[in-house]
Amino acid sequence: MAKQSMKAREVKRVALADKYFAKRAELKAIISDVNASDEDRWNAVLKLQSLPRDSSPSRQRNRCRQTGRPHGYVGKFGLSRIKLREAAMRGEVPGLKKASW
């Protein structure tokens, strides 16, 4: 089980990424625009650097919804491999069954 502070930190990162998504996209568009002046592009780089570090979506870590475990995350279900196996063995995941060949 992950610490509550780690789970809260991830929630904060998601909220910040949502809040600054449009602003970051706008600045990145200016930076990648070859027709923009060098000064405008440089100012956009500086503004992008001044945004909160956690507002970048790449800082987010996928975590299990039940335990907060960061490793062994199965994205289709939003669970770690351990909790996914437990749920599958209880028959709580429709269409998922134990492999047998």
Swiss-Prot record:
Family: Belongs to the universal ribosomal protein uS14 family.
Subunit details: Part of the 30S ribosomal subunit. Contacts proteins S3 and S10.
Role according to the record: Binds 16S rRNA, required for the assembly of 30S particles and may also be responsible for determining the conformation of the 16S rRNA at the A site.
Gene Ontology cellular component terms for the protein in this record: cytoplasm; small ribosomal subunit
GO MF annotations in UniProt: rRNA binding; structural constituent of ribosome
Region (Disordered): 51-70
Keywords: Ribonucleoprotein, Ribosomal protein, RNA-binding, rRNA-binding
Keyword DNA-binding: no
GO BP terms, alphabetized: translation
Alphabetical list of Pfam families matching this protein: Ribosomal_S14 (PF00253)
Protein name stated in the entry: Small ribosomal subunit protein uS14
